[in-house]
């Protein structure tokens, strides 16, 4: 081998060695990058694992909470069913008590009405209550007018105005209530008037009974005869006797009707 060939071989060998060292550096650099990637991937994996474990824990907690909610929902449904049944029982009891109270109230009102009719105090009480209601209505109207005047003079004060308006509304409501009561009393008064008219008709009927009496008819016939004969004095005497007889019979019929 010549010296030149040896020199070229040495240069080629050094070149290969340099190439090998370059490749080694690239391999080491690549290994370092791969290790960094592996480390980063491992860290990310650990983070994801921690997140996953946290999510799993949250899932178990939510599952447990959901079971608790379902158990609570079942308990509430059971309680609602019990409350509904109890409410239905209470409603039935209330309806029965309400019906009994209405019956007792009707019975009491009937007894009071019978008592008032027996002792003739209903009409007096109604008249007195009617007068009282009218007086109260008049007082309330006066108070309402006074409040209206006060409200006009106190419009600058909002709080006082609102209070007066509230009082006015209450007074108007009470006035409507009393007017309804007055209407009830007027209806009762009309009923009493109808009863009075009926009694007056009975009285007229009783007063007409003497027309069917034999003695009364006889005297009337005599009266007609005397009237035809222009016997005025006898006619007047018989007329007086007939009126006295009618009055006596009417009083007798009234005593019998009592």
From Swiss-Prot:
Which stretches are annotated as coiled coil? 13-90, 123-191, 226-256
The protein's superkingdom reads Eukaryota
Record's subcellular location:
Cytoplasm; Cell projection, Cilium
Q: Keywords in alphabetical order, please.
A: Cell projection, Coiled coil, Cytoplasm
GO CC, sorted alphabetically, is: cytoplasm; sperm midpiece
Complexes and interactors = May interact with TEKT2.
Similarity remark: Belongs to the CCDC172 family.
Protein name per UniProt: Coiled-coil domain-containing protein 172
- Organism, by scientific name, is Homo sapiens
């Amino acid at each position: 081998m010549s010296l030149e060939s040896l020199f070229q071989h040495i240069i080629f060998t050094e070149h290969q060695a340099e190439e090998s060292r370059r490749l080694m550096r690239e391999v080491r650099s690549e290994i370092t990058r791969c290790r960094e990637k592996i480390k980063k991937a491992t860290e990310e994996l650990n983070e994801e694992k921690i997140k996953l474990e946290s999510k799993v824990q949250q899932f178990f907690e939510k599952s447990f909470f959901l079971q608790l909610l379902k158990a609570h929902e079942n308990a509430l449904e059971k309680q609602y069913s019990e409350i509904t049944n109890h409410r239905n029982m209470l409603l039935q009891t209330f309806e029965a008590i309400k019906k009994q109270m209405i019956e007792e109230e009707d019975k009491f009102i009937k007894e009071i009405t019978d008592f008032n009719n027996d002792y003739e105090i209903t009409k007096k009480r109604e008249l007195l209550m009617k007068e009282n209601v009218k007086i109260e209505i008049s007082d309330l109207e006066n108070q309402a007018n006074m409040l209206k005047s006060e409200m006009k003079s106190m419009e600058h004060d909002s709080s006082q105005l609102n209070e007066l308006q509230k009082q006015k509304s209450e007074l108007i409501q009470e006035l409507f209530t009393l007017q309804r009561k007055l209407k009830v009393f007027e209806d009762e008064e009309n009923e009493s008037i109808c009863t009075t008219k009926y009694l007056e008709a009975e009285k007229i009927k009783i007063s007409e009974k003497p027309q069917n009496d034999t003695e009364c008819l006889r005297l009337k016939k005599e009266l007609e005869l005397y009237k035809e004969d222009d016997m005025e004095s006898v006619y007047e005497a018989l007329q007086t006797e007939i009126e006295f007889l009618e009055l006596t019979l009417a009083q007798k019929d009234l005593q019998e009707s009592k």
